[in-house]
Amino acid sequence: MTSLSRPCVEFISTILQTVLNLGLLCLGLILVVFLGKETVHLADVLFAPEQTSKYELVEGLVVYFLYFEFIALIVKYFQSGFHFPLRYFVYIGITAIVRLIIVDHKSPLDVLIYSAAILLLVITLWLCNSKRLKRE
C-alpha cells in the first residue's frame, strides 16, 4: 500500500473542507428561510382572533429558538476556524428537551426522566465551561 504525498493529502483535505463549508452555508440559508416562516407562523398564532392554545405559542417559540441556535452554531463554526464548540450542541440539546416536555407532558415519569437529562446536560455545560476544558 502506498502512502499519499503531503501535497496530495492537503489538496484532498482542502476539497473536503470546501464541500463541508458549502454544505453548511446551504444549510444555514435553509434555516434562515425556516426561521422566517416560523416568525410568520408565530405572528399568526399571536394575533389570531380565535383563542389559541398557549402551549402552541410556547412550542412555536421553542422551535424558533432551535432554528436560531442552529444558525448561531453555523456562524460560530465559521468564526472559530471551522470547528464546532461543544457547548452549542449542549444548548441545542437542552432546548430540544424543553420543547419535548412542553409538547409531551402527559406522563409524569417521562417528564422526570427528561428533567434528569436536562440536569445532566447542565452539568456537562458546567464542566465544558470550567477552566480545564475552556478553549475560547
Curated annotation (Swiss-Prot):
<dbReference type="GO" id="GO:0016036">
    <property type="term" value="P:cellular response to phosphate starvation"/>
</dbReference>
<keyword id="KW-0472">Membrane</keyword>
<comment type="similarity">
    <text>Belongs to the PsiE family.</text>
</comment>
<feature type="transmembrane region" description="Helical">
    <location>
        <begin position="82"/>
        <end position="102"/>
    </location>
</feature>
<keyword id="KW-0997">Cell inner membrane</keyword>
<dbReference type="InterPro" id="IPR009315">
    <property type="entry name" value="P_starv_induced_PsiE"/>
</dbReference>
<dbReference type="InterPro" id="IPR020948">
    <property type="entry name" value="P_starv_induced_PsiE-like"/>
</dbReference>
<keyword id="KW-0812">Transmembrane</keyword>
<keyword id="KW-1003">Cell membrane</keyword>
<protein>
    <recommendedName>
        <fullName>Protein PsiE</fullName>
    </recommendedName>
</protein>
<feature type="transmembrane region" description="Helical">
    <location>
        <begin position="55"/>
        <end position="75"/>
    </location>
</feature>
<keyword id="KW-1133">Transmembrane helix</keyword>
<feature type="transmembrane region" description="Helical">
    <location>
        <begin position="15"/>
        <end position="35"/>
    </location>
</feature>
<feature type="transmembrane region" description="Helical">
    <location>
        <begin position="108"/>
        <end position="128"/>
    </location>
</feature>
<dbReference type="Pfam" id="PF06146">
    <property type="entry name" value="PsiE"/>
</dbReference>
<dbReference type="GO" id="GO:0005886">
    <property type="term" value="C:plasma membrane"/>
</dbReference>
